[in-house]
Structure formats: C-alpha cells, structure tokens
Swiss-Prot record:
GO CC, one annotated term: DNA polymerase III complex
Name of the protein described by the UniProt record: DNA-directed RNA polymerase III subunit RPC9
Membrane-topology annotation of the record: Peripheral membrane protein
Protein's cellular compartments: Nucleus; Cell membrane
Species of origin: Mus musculus
Tissue specificity: Ubiquitous. Most prevalent in testis.
Function according to Swiss-Prot or TrEMBL: DNA-dependent RNA polymerase catalyzes the transcription of DNA into RNA using the four ribonucleoside triphosphates as substrates. Specific peripheric component of RNA polymerase III (Pol III) which synthesizes small non-coding RNAs including 5S rRNA, snRNAs, tRNAs and miRNAs from at least 500 distinct genomic loci. With POLR3H/RPC8 forms a mobile stalk that protrudes from Pol III core and functions primarily in transcription initiation. Pol III plays a key role in sensing and limiting infection by intracellular bacteria and DNA viruses.
Primary localization class, coarse: nucleus
Protein family: Belongs to the eukaryotic RPC9 RNA polymerase subunit family.
Gene Ontology MF, one: DNA-directed RNA polymerase activity
Length: 148
C-alpha cells in the first residue's frame, strides 16, 4: 500500500466519533449483514474505536463547541497539531499543557499557560472520566463529613 499524502487532513476525536457513529447508523438502517471477513474486521475496528473514543471528552463536544474552541485558540500561538491535542485530551493541569505544547518553556510564560488552561476548561466540556472522578471525590467528601 502506498500513502499518497500522509497529512491530507487531521481529524479530531470528535470528528472520528461522529463519522463512525453515522456510519454505524447507516449500516443499521440499510440492514447490511456481516457476511465477508473484511466486513467483520471493519465492524470490529468500528466497535473498538467507538468504545475507546466514547470514554474521551469528545463524547460531550459539538460542532459549535469545537468552533468556539478553535476561535478562542487563535490568540494563542500554537500549531494545528497542538490545538488538536488540546481539543482531544482536554488538559486540566499546567503540566498536561506543557507536555502537549512543544518547547513550552521557551514559548509560553506561566501566565500564558494559565490563560490557555482557563480557555480549555471553560470551553470544552468535561469527559466521562472527569465527571466520574468528580462524583467519586464528592462521595468521599460527603462520607467524611457525616458523623459515624
């Protein structure tokens, strides 16, 4: 197999999630069965990819949120790949941002990192794991407050 253009387009997890969800719905509606081995492989890959991606923050994103995020990111001097990583992973700490932004020590001040972190957390919705860990920590806090 020959790769014609390796960087034809970069897709966010949200775009892949939407594409695979739509594909799954189309196949359900058309009633195509899993006859060929290739079809079974495609179904397995689609299932595993959707299973993984549904655990990421992209599950709660929408086209409007993605557009708002990209508009807000214009003021930050980041590459397309760095913006894509921020969109896909929704970092919650300065350390996570420093890991995603190449040469962040030279390119960004602490104030810029904090501003970037604020932009990311205020625009992008939390992922399923973030919500679950938040509810778990709230449950623990409530148990500690109740007298035994």
């Amino acid at each position: 197999m020959e790769v014609k253009d390796a960087n034809a387009a970069l897709l966010s997890n949200y775009e892949v999630f939407q594409l695979l969800t739509d594909l799954k719905e189309q196949r359900k509606e058309s009633g195509k069965n899993k006859h060929s081995a290739g079809q079974q492989n495609l179904n397995a890959i689609t299932y595993e990819t959707l299973k993984y991606i549904s655990k990421t923050p992209c599950r709660n994103q929408s086209p409007a949120i993605v557009q708002e995020f990209l508009t807000a990111m214009k003021s930050h001097k980041l590459t397309k790949a760095e913006k894509l990583q921020l969109l896909n992973h929704r970092p919650m700490t300065a350390v996570e941002i420093q890991l995603m932004v190449e040469e962040s020590e030279e390119r960004l001040t602490e104030e810029q990192i904090e501003a970037l972190l604020h932009t990311v957390t205020s625009i992008l919705p939390a992922g399923p794991e973030d919500e679950q860990s938040k509810s778990t920590s709230n449950d623990v806090a409530m148990e500690e407050e109740e007298p035994a």
